[in-house]
Structures are given as C-alpha cells and as structure tokens.
Amino acid sequence: MRELAGSPGTWSGLSLRVGQLVFAAASVCATASALGFAAYTAFCYLIASMGLQALWSLGLACLDCYALKFKKDLHSAVLLSLFVVGDWVTAILSFAASCSAAGVVVLFDRDIYACRNPQLPCGRFELAIACAFLSWAFSATSALVMFWLLASL
C-alpha cells in the first residue's frame, strides 16, 4: 500500500492531529472567555463541536504516538473505517459550527451594528471562528487522506 502524507501512525498524521487539537482548543478558549457567549446558540454549538473535535484529535494523536513509538501499523480496514467515519463526522460538525457562528458575527457586525457595543466581544468571537475554521481545515485534510487510504485497500 502506498504511504500518504497524513496517514495514521506517521509523523505527518500526528502533525495533522496536533493541528486539529491546538486550533480546536484555542477556539473553545476564545469563545468561553468571551462574556455573554451562552446567550447565542451558535456559539454554544461552536464550543460543543470544537470540544468534540479536540477530544477526537487528542485520542488519535495519542494513538499516533503509540504507533510511532512501538512501530505499529494502523492501516487495517477496521481502523481506517473507524477513522474515516470519525473524521468525516467531526469535520462536518466543525464546518457547520464555524459557519453558523460566522453568520452570527456577520449579522452582528454588518447588519445590526452590535459590534459597536463594547460589551459584545466580537473580536474574541472572530478569533474563535478563525481557529475553528483552521481546525476544520486540518480535519477535512485528515478525512480526505483516511478516505483515500480506505479506498486503496
């Protein structure tokens, strides 16, 4: 089987997982530190989605570390099927949450001019959304690699 960049059990796969984890955690921290985020469903959904993304990425990063340390092969059909489903689910949830939160911020900023109010931390929301989109980009890349590997078995 051909070795792809981002395959499970490789350094590039570990770097994809760490990127997902770091940006998902940064998104959660930025959103949770913004006062009043709980009043808006899109930001609650963003925290839930990025929390799930962080947990999934942490688990697979640990699995990649284990595989690298003990030189294990993670290219079995069962494992790749699990990775494909998990990556696609988290990627779709991350994208939906990022888009919905971005839509709310665009509404606040461009339509009702609520970001002029200093009590609404639009800058933190924008930072959280940017981190969420970056986490989604890593997740979508990983999902495509896993799907490609599964298809090549």
From Swiss-Prot:
It is a multi-pass membrane protein. Residues 1-20, 64-76, 150-153 are cytoplasmic. Disulfide bonds: none annotated. GO terms for cellular component: membrane; plasma membrane. Keywords: Cell membrane, Membrane, Transmembrane, Transmembrane helix. InterPro entries: CASP_dom (IPR006702), CASPL-5 (IPR045009). The chain crosses the membrane at residues 21-41, 43-63, 77-97, 129-149. It is found in: Cell membrane. Pfam families: CASP_dom (PF04535). Residues 42, 98-128 are extracellular. Homodimer and heterodimers. Belongs to the Casparian strip membrane proteins (CASP) family. This is CASP-like protein 5B1. It comes from Oryza sativa subsp. japonica. The lineage of its organism: Eukaryota, Viridiplantae, Streptophyta, Embryophyta, Tracheophyta.
